Amino acid sequence: MFHMSWIDRAVARENEILRIIKSFGKSKLEFILVGGYAVSALARQRFSVDCDVVIPKNLAKKFEELLRKEGYKVGQTKAGFDEAYGGEFASFRKKVGDLPVTIDLLIGSLVSRGTSASWSYQYIKENSVNATLITGKESLEVSVPEKELLVAFKIHAGREADLRDIVMLTHGLDLGKVRKHTQRGEMSKVREHIASELKSLNNPKVVLSLKGVYEIGGDTSESVSRAARLLENLTKST
């Protein structure tokens, strides 16, 4: 009996996610890609096991109908997702081989559970850009939050994975925009996140994990320094 390798299974899962993103576009459904795939489109490709999209509230039923038609079922909310995001969302799951594929719909807004900050779909749309998502041999035009807004989401989420993404997104950032997008929710908690993230940037394990997740062979010290400067500047103004 033929057994797929772990890499083959992971690629099959990624291909399924790309297929679903394409099907949203073909169905003329409006959405903005956030999470790991948005980072891949704006910075450097990184492995992501699920797909997060922010959608207009009035299209929620159409998205759900399409996903059900494609064999997805309403799944249990993942703990990681639950820790990071609040607000209204629906999580859909399907198995590809023996690996689960998860599509998370953030309905009407993106809400940071840890800081109670909220960004409406309209706000995200007004601060989004078109980008090319490239995975393997596939490429796809998608709408994603501009870098500065994506960094703000990551600062509010405050997990180690988010800090790695911040490091990868810091090239050519507009500090004023990051500040504007970040200043919402419980600012005392935002300041705590920034202080914790600055401390983590001095941890060699974080740099090593950065290289692993993004498959970077070279020196990352410049990117880490840029991220530290960004967070230090935000500390002065938040």
Label for each model-derived stretch:
Residues M1-T238:
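Compositionally biased terminal segments of proteins
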